[in-house]
C-alpha cells in the first residue's frame, strides 16, 4: 500500500502544478488496503479537502491503482484530522532562492520566458521580512490629479541637463535614515509596502511575476517595455511597485517614477497651460525607470500620447526601463495611436488572470495573518470557492468577516462567514453554467452548440470543444466527470486531457491566451 502511494504521489507531483500538489495530494495518507475486496482507503485532514479530492482526483488515483495492482480498485476517502500532520503544511516550506531568468531580446514572447519559470513558480512565496518600515504616509500615497502644480520631483540640475545615464550603485538595502527614505519614496511615488515578498504567486500570475523579477534584475535590458494587462484587482499595480522597490534596494540612486495615467494626462495639461514643456521633458526623459499604470486612460488624448511617445523613445534609446499596465490587451485599447501600440508590442506583453482556487486560499490566509487573525483552512476554502473574480474582492470579503466577527463577539466559522457574506454570496450563486460556456465558445469560434457534445472530431470543432472544457473546469465548480457528462457523455480522462492541453498551450501561445482572456471577460460580464 505504501509503495503504491509513493508511486502514485510521484506521478501526481509531475502531473500537477506545485501548488496543486502541495494543497491537495501531499496532505493525503493511505490508511487501509483490503486485498479481498480490492478497496483502498485514503485519509484527508478535513471535510473540504476530502470532498474536493474525491470529486477532482479520485478517478486518476483509481486509474493509477488499477495499473499498479493490475485489477480494478475502489478508492474510498475517509476523514482523519491527523492525516495533515504527516506532511508539512503548504506554507511551511521556506522560500527557495530566486533563480535568475536568462535574458532575452526586446521582442521576447510569453513562450520565451515560460521555459525558465520552474525555479521561480515552484518556490513558495516568501513571507514579508520582519523589518520595521518608516516611510511617511505621503510616500505610500498616489499623486492626486488636482495637485496645485505639475509634480516633477527635483533632480540635480547639472545631471538632468546633461542627460547622464549612468547608474549610481547603492547599498543592498534602503537608506537607514528615515528622512532619506521618506524623501526617496516621495520622489518616486512608490508604495514601499508592495514588494515581491508579499506578492502571492500562483498559476494565474507566475509568468507576470517571473517577467517582473527579470526586469528588476536587468532594467533596460530584458523585456523593454514590459506590458502587463488584466482586470481590476489582480495585482498589476502591486507588481510594478515591487519592481520599483526592488530597484531602489539594489541601486539607491536610481531615478524612478510611478504615475497613474490620469495624473500624467493632468501634468501634460498643466505643462501646456504654463508653457513648461522643457521642464516636463527634461524630467521624464532623464528617468531610469518609468512605471505608467492604467494606460487606457490615454485613450483619445492625442497631445498626451504625443508627449508620451517622445518620452518613451528617449527612455528606450537610453536603455531606461518602461513598464506599463492596462485593463486589456494593447491592440484592444481604443483611441490609442498606432505608433504607441507598435512600441508596446516591441517588448513583452503578459496577462494576469484571475487567481485559481489554491492561490485564492493562500491570499486569504496570508492577509488574515497580516491582520493578526488565525483563519482556519476550512473558512478560507469556503470563501475562495465562492468568490472567484479578483484579489480586491477577496480582501474586501475578509474585512467584512473580521468586522462581523468583532461586532458580534463570535469566533470566525463557516456559519459566521455565511452570515457576514450573505449578500455577496447571493450574487455569486448566480454562477456561470457549462451550458453558457458552450454557447459563448461556439459563437466565438462560429460553430454550432450541438458540436460541443457531438462525436465529431475535425480540428475546427475539437479545438473549441477543448477550450470550452478548459473554461468549464476553470469557471465552474463542476467535477471532471460532471463536465464530461455535459459534453456528450465523455470520460473524465478526456476532460482532463483537454484541460491540461489548453492550460499548457495558453502559457506558450499569446494568441490563444488573448482569446481565452476575451472569453473569460465575456462570461463574467
From Swiss-Prot:
SMART domains in the record: AAA, Bac_DnaA_C
Pfam families per the UniProt record, alphabetical: Bac_DnaA, Bac_DnaA_C, DnaA_N
Residues covered by region (Domain I, interacts with DnaA modulators): 1-71
Family matches, as CDD domains: AAA, Bac_DnaA_C
Transmembrane segments: none
Low complexity bias locations: 169-181
Record's keyword annotation contains ATP-binding: yes
Region (Domain IV, binds dsDNA): 406-525
List of residues binding ATP: 233, 235-237
Example of a GO cellular component annotation carried by this entry: cytoplasm
Keyword Transcription among UniProt keywords: no
Renumbered residue ranges of the record's region Domain II: 71-188
UniProt-annotated stretches for the region Domain III, AAA+ region: 189-405
UniProt-annotated stretches for the region Disordered: 160-182
Keywords, alphabetical: ATP-binding, Cytoplasm, DNA replication, DNA-binding, Lipid-binding, Nucleotide-binding
GO molecular function terms listed in the Swiss-Prot or TrEMBL record: ATP binding; ATP hydrolysis activity; DNA replication origin binding; lipid binding
GO biological process, one term: DNA replication initiation
Compartments, as annotated in UniProt: Cytoplasm
Task performed by this protein: Plays an essential role in the initiation and regulation of chromosomal replication. ATP-DnaA binds to the origin of replication (oriC) to initiate formation of the DNA replication initiation complex once per cell cycle. Binds the DnaA box (a 9 base pair repeat at the origin) and separates the double-stranded (ds)DNA. Forms a right-handed helical filament on oriC DNA; dsDNA binds to the exterior of the filament while single-stranded (ss)DNA is stabiized in the filament's interior.
Subunit structure, as described in the record: Oligomerizes as a right-handed, spiral filament on DNA at oriC.
Family affiliation: Belongs to the DnaA family.
Entry comment, domain topic: Domain I is involved in oligomerization and binding regulators, domain II is flexibile and of varying length in different bacteria, domain III forms the AAA+ region, while domain IV binds dsDNA.
Name of the protein described by the UniProt record: Chromosomal replication initiator protein DnaA
Organism in which the protein naturally occurs: Burkholderia cenocepacia (strain ATCC BAA-245 / DSM 16553 / LMG 16656 / NCTC 13227 / J2315 / CF5610) (Burkholderia cepacia (strain J2315))
